[in-house]
Each structure stands twice: as C-alpha cells, then as structure tokens.
A protein has these predicted regions:
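Active-site neighborhood of glycoside hydrolase catalytic domains
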Residues: 1-25, 31, 38, 51
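Carbohydrate-binding surfaces of carbohydrate-active enzymes
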Residues: 7, 15, 19-20, 49-339
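Histidine-centered catalytic/metal-binding microenvironments
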Residues: 27-30, 141-143
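Short, catalytically relevant binding-site loops at active-site mouths
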Residues: 30-31, 261
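Short, solvent-exposed loop/turn segments at secondary-structure junctions
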Residues: 31-34, 64
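Distinct, well-ordered alpha-helical segments
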Residues: 33-47
Length: 339
C-alpha cells in the first residue's frame, strides 16, 4: 500500500510540474526496519516506477553510530543504481554541539550525539567517505541548527566539498567482488526477531570484514550474477526466490537465524575460498572504488592493508601517515586517492 501511494503521488507530481522536476521519497529501509509492520517491503515496486527519480534515507542509527564499524546503509544501495535511481543520503551527522531540542528524555539518548570533538571528526570523515566512494548524493542535515557551528567542522565540510567536486571527473565505479542479496518479502514471513538478527545486525560484521561489498534485492540477481566472485544471501526465512538462487548457485554463503552470529573472520574465510581480494586480514572498515580508498581502523596497530598488484595510494585526507610503516590508533579514518 505504501509503495503504491508513493508511486501515485510521484506520478501526480510529475504531471502537475510537466515533468520538469525530479521527484523522490524516503523509502525502502529493507535492512534498517525489517519488521513486517514497517511498510518498507515493496522497494522493488518503487524502483520500477518511472515517476520516482530518487530515494532517501538517513545513515543507519545502529549502535548510536559509535566508532569502529561501518555505519551501514538502510537499503540495498546497488539495486537503486541498477534501476537508474539516485540515492540521496540524509547525513544527519551529530556533533559535540548537538543538543536536545526539547526537554524530553527521548532526545537525551546517545544517538543524538557524539559527546566529544574527536568522535565528531571521525564520524564526519566516515560519513563523507561512504558517499564519495559509493558514488551517491548526500546532504549534511543540520536538523535544528548549530550542529556544525564550529571552525574545525566548517573547514572539514569545505575540504570535503573540494574533494567531492574533484571526484566528479574520476571513475567511481565499484570494484567489489562480493554481493549481498536480500529478499525484502522474507521479512514479511520470518518469525519475530529473525529479520533484525539477519538483515539488521549482520551488516555490522559485513562492514568490518576487510573487503567492500555491494547490496541488491534478489530480483536483480540474474542481471548481476556474473559480475561478482562471491554472494552472501541474507535469509531470515527461505523464500522461493532465494531458494531459486541457491539452487542455481550452491556456493552462496547463506546467513540464517541459525548462523547469524557469524564472525568477521568466518566471512573472510568464505571470501578467500571464493578468490575475493581482502584489503585487510583483520577487522577494518575499507571502502574502495576505482579511484579512492578509505580506511577506518577498528584496533590499534599496523594497517596491514593488502593492495592489488600495481595499486599505489596518495593520501588526500586525515593525519598524514605511512600506512606501510606506521602503527595506527584505533577508530581513526584515512582517505586515499588511487594512483
């Protein structure tokens, strides 16, 4: 019902503006709100609506956006790209200046802040890099004002703008060798809690396995099945569409309620078995495309980056480091251009 109304309103807006304006909606939170009552389980219908030009969502609120993991996408980003839809991310990135707008306990939860400048800086770097490297649009959402009213943050946003503008002349295509597949309808039939355990929680482990991945709805599998070396299927319950994929490709890794506590090392082991290049053999957030690489450390120590043969990096943001020689502190981010 929700998807149908979005398509109807989008068509109405297009007609009334004589197709001069782009039209979009906040919708498709397949990973973030897997509960069957969330009304976010007909994304494929919206992706096939010609009147919808873009879709939006915030960055996941997982674990109050703390350090040490990739703040994941709420939706299967690469299905949007495949269907010609722009993804427009709402970067409502809190800072140490963020204060509750009202004296209501709900707004005092930790999600409304990092409590210090250091964590703010690292979150801003992470949130910019995810958009730059995954090649989508975003805006900094200063929700009720004053969040970025600090010289360091304003300088960072100015620096990011320059990098983003320069990136428009570069190839930001995916180099991922892993695809994550989900059937949004599985969330409608799964037992209570299984959607969260499989589709929501697993994103945290996927994000630190040391190699990038793309994400798709299962309806797009046939079109992309020859593009990737490894497939990870998120199955809170096994639907006919997922079963069809597994029959055709029994080498998929299937994550179910029974094995959803899978570790990052187990994910790396699977990737190795499929010939996937691991940029890190230890837990790390690694975003990579054809022109940029971003590293967010999860632990203290050497970076242990393993680059494909012939690849060289030039650091363009973050405290200057020699990643081949220098031990890095945990929870810090470094952005590089690939030469």
């Amino acid at each position: 019902m929700t998807a149908g109304r979005i398509c109807e309103f989008a068509q109405f807006a297009k007609e009334k503006t004589r197709h001069r304006l782009v039209v979009g909606a906040f919708y498709g939170y397949t990973f973030e709100t897997p509960e069957r009552q969330s009304n976010h389980h007909a994304l494929y219908q919206v992706l096939n609506c010609d009147s919808v030009d873009f879709l939006c969502s915030p960055i996941s609120y997982m674990d109050n956006r703390g350090p040490g993991f990739a703040h994941p996408y709420m939706l299967p980003l690469d299905s949007l790209k495949k269907h010609g839809k722009l993804y427009f991310a709402e970067n409502d990135s809190r800072t140490h200046l963020t204060r509750p707008p009202y004296d209501i306990p709900h707004f005092n939860r930790p999600v409304w802040m990092p409590r210090d400048k250091w964590l703010t800086v690292e979150n801003l770097k992470l949130h910019f890099a995810r958009a730059l490297i995954h090649a989508h649009a975003f805006w900094w959402f200063d929700m009720w004002g004053g969040w970025y009213r600090y010289p360091l943050y304003m300088q960072m946003l100015a620096d990011f703008h320059g990098i983003a503008k320069d990136s428009l002349q570069k190839d930001r295509g995916s180099v991922s060798e892993v695809a994550v597949i989900v059937d949004e309808k599985a969330n409608c039939y799964a037992a209570e809690g299984n959607g969260k355990a499989v589709c929501y929680d697993t994103r945290k482990t996927l994000g630190i396995m040391g190699t990038p991945f793309d994400s798709y709805l299962c309806e797009d599998y046939e079109a992309i099945k020859d593009r990737y070396k490894a497939f990870i299927v998120l199955a809170p319950c096994l639907t006919p569409k997922l079963q069809q994929i597994l029959t055709e490709n029994p080498d998929c890794l299937v994550i179910t309620p029974e094995n959803c506590k899978i570790t990052s090392e187990e994910l790396r082991s699977f990737c190795r078995s499929r010939g996937v290049h691991l940029y890190s053999e230890k837990d790390a957030v690694v975003y990579v495309n054809r022109s940029y690489l971003f590293l967010h450390t999860v632990s203290d120590g050497p970076a242990d980056l393993h680059l494909p043969e012939g690849v060289r990096l030039r650091q363009i943001y973050g405290d200057p480091v020699d990643i081949e020689k220098t031990g890095l502190p945990k929870y810090e981010g470094y952005l590089f251009e690939i030469e």
